[in-house]
Amino acid sequence: DKMHVDRETFEGISLEEMLRRMDAANIERVFLVAAKVGVKHHPACYHVPYDLVAEAVRRYPHRFSALAGLDPTEGMDGVRALERAVKEHGFIGAHFYPHWFELPPDHAKWYPFYAKCVELDIPVQLQVGQSLVYDPTYPRRSVGRPIALDAVACDFPELKLIGIHVGIPWTDEMIAMAWKHRNVFIVSDAHSPKYWPQSFVRYIDSYGQDK
């Protein structure tokens, strides 16, 4: 309810319906995320199979690009799966939600994935800012403070880090990280522009236009 997603969309639509909606909105291409939302064994969590997203991209390569979700509890098995997704299925980046695992972006369990992203020359995008209570049986702490990207950007200067969801309510921290580090960027998704903090509006209207 908080995300204002209609039931049909939440339960899943066909690729053809998605393309119809994209055309209606004049959207040429989108990312399809093989999201890993929490640990597999919990009923409130789910993993979108890499193969499912890879098949959609195979069918409509000019409309979809694939991002590989990350689960830090998978360890090196997850790192190897990421490599296969990129090398065998053409995934163009990695994606993760820190709060679903209650591990901030600078936690050591994410570092093998960062190293592999550098090796594969792909970016990683991650949610920054607060988390919601998506399921009452699985409340998660908000561990996505943008300041946590500081250590990651210092330790992996070759890694392109993309903070999604603007960083609200710590938007100024996200701006500071993008200003400090040439390899840190902000994505203005999730929140309608009318709700963007004024500091973010000023940032993208001025010295943050290329970040």
Question: How would you describe each model-predicted region?
Answer:
Residues 91-93, 103-211:
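Catalytic pocket-lining loop regions of alpha/beta-barrel enzymes
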Residues 1-35, 40-44:
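An N-terminally biased module of ancient metal coordination in phosphate/nucleic-acid-related enzymes
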Residues 14-16, 46-51, 145-148:
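Well-ordered, non-membrane alpha-helical segments in soluble/globular domains
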Residues 6-9, 44, 69, 101, ...:
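Short N-terminal micro-motifs specific to bacterial/archaeal maturation
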Residues 2, 10-14, 41-45, 75-77, ...:
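Alpha-helix capping and helix-coil boundary motifs
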Residues 28-133, 137-140:
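Active-site gating/metal-coordination segments in enzymes
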Residues 12-22, 74-85, 171:
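Short, acidic/polar
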Residues 17-25, 55-59, 84-88, 151-152, ...:
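A generic secondary-structure signal
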